[in-house]
From Swiss-Prot:
<comment type="pathway">
    <text>Glycan biosynthesis; trehalose biosynthesis.</text>
</comment>
<protein>
    <recommendedName>
        <fullName>Probable trehalose-phosphate phosphatase G</fullName>
        <ecNumber>3.1.3.12</ecNumber>
    </recommendedName>
</protein>
<dbReference type="Pfam" id="PF02358">
    <property type="entry name" value="Trehalose_PPase"/>
</dbReference>
<feature type="region of interest" description="Disordered">
    <location>
        <begin position="1"/>
        <end position="20"/>
    </location>
</feature>
<dbReference type="InterPro" id="IPR006379">
    <property type="entry name" value="HAD-SF_hydro_IIB"/>
</dbReference>
<dbReference type="GO" id="GO:0004805">
    <property type="term" value="F:trehalose-phosphatase activity"/>
</dbReference>
<comment type="function">
    <text>Removes the phosphate from trehalose 6-phosphate to produce free trehalose. Trehalose accumulation in plant may improve abiotic stress tolerance.</text>
</comment>
<keyword id="KW-0346">Stress response</keyword>
<dbReference type="InterPro" id="IPR036412">
    <property type="entry name" value="HAD-like_sf"/>
</dbReference>
<keyword id="KW-0378">Hydrolase</keyword>
<dbReference type="GO" id="GO:0005992">
    <property type="term" value="P:trehalose biosynthetic process"/>
</dbReference>
<dbReference type="InterPro" id="IPR044651">
    <property type="entry name" value="OTSB-like"/>
</dbReference>
<dbReference type="InterPro" id="IPR003337">
    <property type="entry name" value="Trehalose_PPase"/>
</dbReference>
<comment type="similarity">
    <text>Belongs to the trehalose phosphatase family.</text>
</comment>
<dbReference type="InterPro" id="IPR023214">
    <property type="entry name" value="HAD_sf"/>
</dbReference>
Length: 377
């Protein structure tokens, strides 16, 4: 893929739309991938006029502080709209009997986001630690169902945070996936190679954006430099994508964050910018997302037969919508949105926060135990 094509602006994704045994497993000279744009540096009004600020605000619902460093979304005061939303996206806990009925004679496969799903949303991403109780619940789920975590974080980082060898891990929004070697043959894809994990076991490593690693590293370093004077801004490198967090930035400085990221990314036409929960994500322009990652994992793990398996994806972020959409449109499973704030989604069910996710997972384990005991006789 030729990264140096004759374009001078990045792809800006969805700027105005408010709203998805071990399995784990050198930079080029600065400027190589940069495009020398001759366009005049835009004024600050650009990010206001093109919808960026609207997108930043819509992806950042109001919150209230509970305890130090932890936040929880505030549900709207309009009880009617809240009830109407819950009718459209009923609680996965109170609807569990219906979920169990859908899973009759099928094997469930569980896919989980990390931040905001298994761990609370916190001011400092480095402190997004899942509780021991949540880790135990996920570990129990993996005893009965194939379980994977698909996170926007790097695969190594999310494995470090979760620390369970029973799971499958996909990082960078699914652009870095490690799975066991399929005895019936590995996917015939140039982006899929055989390697060994941390325990020395042979695994398949799928990285559809591996050629972008140098440019992501370059952009990360540049974004750190150009945002270092903005109090509260934090830039993270997730190997195949990078993120600029503005959760701790004074709202009056949001336009400055947006403008600096926007201006810099004009030099990289093969990168796009998307909006998450108080974060700007920079990622390669490739046809890959969490939905594609779910499909890849189902195929790689031999779980793609709709008549035999029921995939469930639990997530809280806009990026999880791609996975929800794949399951909904393929009539092969369903998504569960983690949110206490009404918003449109491709999910079928909802949970308010990570504490309800834990409760749902425990309920799923109880059901799994019961079903397992039936088949043992």
């Amino acid at each position: 893929m030729d990264l140096n094509i004759n374009k001078t602006t990045p792809v800006l994704s969805d700027p105005t739309t408010p709203v998805s045994k071990t399995r784990l497993g050198s930079s080029f000279p600065s400027g190589r991938f940069m495009m020398n744009s001759r366009k005049k540096i835009p004024k600050l009004d650009d990010v206001r006029s093109n919808g960026w600020l609207d997108a930043m605000i819509s992806s950042s619902p109001p919150r209230k502080r509970l305890v130090k460093d932890f936040n929880i979304e505030i549900a709207p005061e309009d009880d009617f709209s809240q009830r109407a939303w819950m009718l459209k996206y009923p609680s996965a806990i109170t609807s569990f009997a219906h979920i169990a009925a859908q899973a009759k004679n099928k094997k469930i496969a569980v896919f989980l986001d990390y931040d905001g799903t298994l761990s609370p949303i916190v001011d400092d991403p480095d402190r997004a630690i899942m509780s021991d109780a949540m880790r135990a619940a996920v570990k129990d789920v993996a005893k009965y169902f194939p379980t994977a975590i698909i996170s926007g974080r790097s695969r190594d980082k999310v494995y470090q945070l979760v620390g369970l060898t029973e799971l499958y891990y996909a990082g960078s929004h699914g652009m870095d996936i490690m799975t066991p070697v399929n005895p019936n043959g590995s996917p015939e894809d140039p982006n899929c190679i055989k390697t060994t994990d941390q325990q020395g076991e042979e695994v398949n490593l799928f990285q559809p954006a591996k050629e972008f690693i140098p440019v992501i590293e370059e952009v990360y370093n540049n974004l750190v430099e150009i945002t270092k004077c903005i109090k509260g801004a934090k830039v993270e490198n997730h190997k195949f994508c990078t993120s600029v967090h503005y959760r701790n930035v004074d709202e009056k400085d949001w336009p400055l964050v947006a403008q600096r990221v926007h201006d810099h990314l004009k030099r990289y036409p093969r990168l796009r910018i998307t909006h998450g929960r108080k974060v700007l994500e920079v990622r390669p322009v490739i046809e890959w997302n969490k939905g594609k990652a779910v499909e890849f994992l189902l195929e790689s793990l031999g779980l793609s037969n709709n008549d035999e398996f029921l995939p469930i994806f639990i997530g809280d972020d806009k990026t999880d919508e791609d996975a929800f959409k794949v399951l909904r449109e393929g009539n092969r499973g369903f998504g569960i949105l983690v949110s206490s704030v009404p918003k449109e989604s491709n999910a079928f069910y909802s949970l308010r926060d990570p504490s309800e996710v834990k409760k749902f997972l425990k309920t799923l384990v109880k059901w799994g135990k019961m079903e397992s005991s039936k088949t043992s006789f």
